[in-house]
């Protein structure tokens, strides 16, 4: 039985990836902060249904000895490094912790693998935010990086570290450059979930206004459940390589609002207000991915529609809010 170790297992991607690997017969391990183990009902809500099937280890990406200890205990065949400070807006507020956690954390994991388990296959969670101020549309594996946030910068550094350990030390170390991917398990701080959650609140009469930043920002949104399948395919490919994973379609925040409110029988114009304070210091105006390489080489497929993704998220939040109101 193969063993997989996931950092960031309590997050959106970690939960879907855990489900996928369990279905494939893996022994799944995850690294979590000790505070999560002490408060699982709140901090591990995405993987609550999996707790009997996975094994969790207390550890911190900011501590090399901590990471070393976990890897020595688990000895994984595959490592999926998903953990990071991933909220772009927050990276402008706290650059130091974003850079420290995301860059040093990645370096620690790679260094531990090189020292203790060089045969383990390593996956790094890259991001479309690495492209930032785009040089071409759509963006593919050859598009130059021009990050516009500390988060984007940290992901470029992680990508370069991963490539360096592959080329310099012979590790099977790969990156998936994933464009925005959402689901009902998305964090409440992200704009897509902020929209769908507030739609549910408005529908139940709990709030009357939703403040958002740049409504014209355009993103390539896909479903996280399909994107974790790509992660596994990248790791299982015969040769270590990097791949862009995306839907290939771009929609604006305004379009997301329109689809979300419309599904609930509402007009977004009646509730959404633009707040200039929510604009980023350096905006990323448009991101569109070209995943042709992944489709051709890995056979990865994405067939969901933008509308179905939005409606799934709204429907889940409407159910969540209905249960909350009843309680």
Question: What residue spans do the PLM features occupy?
Answer:
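C-terminal substrate-binding subdomain of Rossmann-fold SDR/epimerase-dehydratase oxidoreductases
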Residues: 23, 30-31, 59, 186-195, ...
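N-terminal Rossmann-like NAD(P)+-binding domain of SDR-like oxidoreductases, especially those catalyzing
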Residues: 1-181, 225, 235, 304, ...
